[in-house]
């Protein structure tokens, strides 16, 4: 088994595992929010679930380039399963506390980063260059399916079987991901051109120097980091926004509707393969999503939010597939682990700051000032409304406006706008066909 068949086989196992993780992630977030009634604690858990992977990402990438990919992926999958087992044990014996969750999801973040970087950098070893678009679109469809089924099932499960059974389902789901990895025969990583032994830190710096040598790439990364800051802030706020006037199962339904959009967008990208100009696809989709973020929270309507969530997630695969394919074609395969993890670290470094600032701005500034008779309510109330959840709504719209400005800045810089055509493709078509 090789090429796309091998990729699809491994992707099948990972999709089952991702579905289990999606159930746990959504259910755990709702459980923390409902038991603490604190947006700040909710956002702190989000920070704990991302920060360790971000900080250690470049070093993980270096090890991905050094180690046997199959052994690394199997180890990361097994480690993730053990983390969920520990969480289930604490919950079953009524020992689970906030700080337990923070520590456990922090460890889970490290294993998740190993899986993400390891799998992403292995795609170009399995799949021929001409099929990268199809593989990346298939990955987007899987993520859409997971987002479609996970939150909806988790919302229903919280109302019926409870979080303990959800954790058990997650543990079982890991066996599928682990099983396919054990059965698969992954291609070996090509040797580095220079036959020299360097430290992990030197390899991280080497990856940064490589990105810096690509005109427009590093500047684009920094600007996209600002966009990711805004998107992450909205991510932290959207669940409390919906829960301010809806039940957990209804919130799960909204996420599932968004998943349908991601599924549709991924299907379109598999058939269309995206625009010829990758950067136009990235920037165009980002600009459209930014405009939608301004409109999405204006009305307290599940239909309204569900519709725009669907559109956002239908557009997202255009940007993600174009971006992933661009990097896979422009970066030499022996750099993939370090380059991809460094890219993720630079972009996602804004995520914890976004989570914390969103929680603080909501609880301390926007929510109090959007109550009846307060300063912001008098100014913005006629459009965004007044009362519970309206502070979140206004804040999301402001993040959308900021995103529009950032995308337009990126579009105006020639080096960023032409990064897809100005840089030569690297010879990465190593996969067996």
Name each model feature, range by range.
Residues 39-40, 129-139, 248, 333-343:
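Loop-to-transmembrane helix entry/capping segments in MFS-fold secondary transporters
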Residues 93-96, 143-180:
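Helix-loop-helix hairpin linking two adjacent transmembrane segments in secondary transporters
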């Amino acid at each position: 088994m090789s090429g796309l068949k091998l990729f699809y086989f491994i992707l099948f196992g990972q999709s089952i595992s991702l579905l289990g993780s999606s159930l746990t992630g959504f259910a755990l977030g709702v459980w923390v929010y409902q038991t603490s009634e604190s947006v700040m604690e909710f956002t702190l858990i989000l920070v704990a679930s991302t920060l360790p992977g971000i900080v250690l990402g470049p070093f993980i990438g270096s090890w991905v380039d050094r180690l046997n990919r199959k052994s690394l992926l199997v180890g990361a999958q097994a480690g993730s399963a053990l983390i969920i087992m520990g969480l289930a044990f604490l919950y079953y014996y009524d020992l689970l506390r906030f700080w337990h969750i923070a520590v456990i999801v922090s460890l889970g973040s490290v294993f998740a980063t190993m899986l993400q970087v390891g799998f992403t950098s292995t795609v170009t070893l399995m799949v021929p260059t001409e099929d990268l678009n199809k593989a990346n679109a298939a990955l987007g469809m899987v993520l859409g399916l997971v987002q479609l089924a996970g939150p909806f099932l988790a919302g229903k499960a919280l109302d019926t079987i409870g979080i303990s059974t959800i954790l058990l389902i997650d543990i079982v789901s890991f066996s599928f991901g682990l099983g396919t990895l054990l059965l698969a025969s992954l291609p070996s990583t090509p040797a580095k051109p220079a036959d020299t032994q360097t430290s992990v830190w030197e390899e991280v710096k080497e990856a940064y120097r490589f990105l810096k040598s690509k005109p427009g790439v590093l500047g684009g990364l920094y600007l996209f980091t600002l966009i990711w800051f805004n998107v992450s802030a909205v991510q932290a706020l959207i669940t409390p926004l919906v829960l301010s006037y809806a039940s957990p199962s209804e919130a799960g339904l909204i996420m599932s509707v968004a998943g349908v959009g991601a599924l549709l967008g991924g299907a379109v990208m598999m058939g269309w393969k995206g625009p010829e100009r990758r950067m136009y696809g990235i920037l165009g989709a980002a600009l459209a999503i930014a405009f939608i973020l301004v409109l999405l929270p204006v009305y307290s309507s599940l239909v309204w939010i569900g519709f725009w969530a669907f559109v956002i997630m239908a557009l997202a695969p255009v940007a993600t597939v174009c971006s992933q394919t661009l990097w896979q074609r422009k970066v030499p395969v022996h750099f993939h682990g370090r380059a991809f993890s460094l890219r993720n670290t630079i972009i996602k470094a804004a995520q914890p700051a976004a989570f914390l600032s969103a929680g603080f701005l909501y609880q301390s500034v926007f929510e109090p000032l959007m109550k009846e008779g307060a300063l912001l309510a008098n100014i913005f109330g006629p459009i965004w409304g007044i009362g519970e959840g309206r502070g979140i709504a206004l804040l999301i719209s402001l993040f959308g406006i900021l995103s529009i400005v950032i995308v337009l800045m990126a579009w105006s810089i020639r080096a960023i706008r032409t990064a897809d055509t100005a840089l030569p493709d690297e010879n990465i078509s190593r996969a067996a066909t």
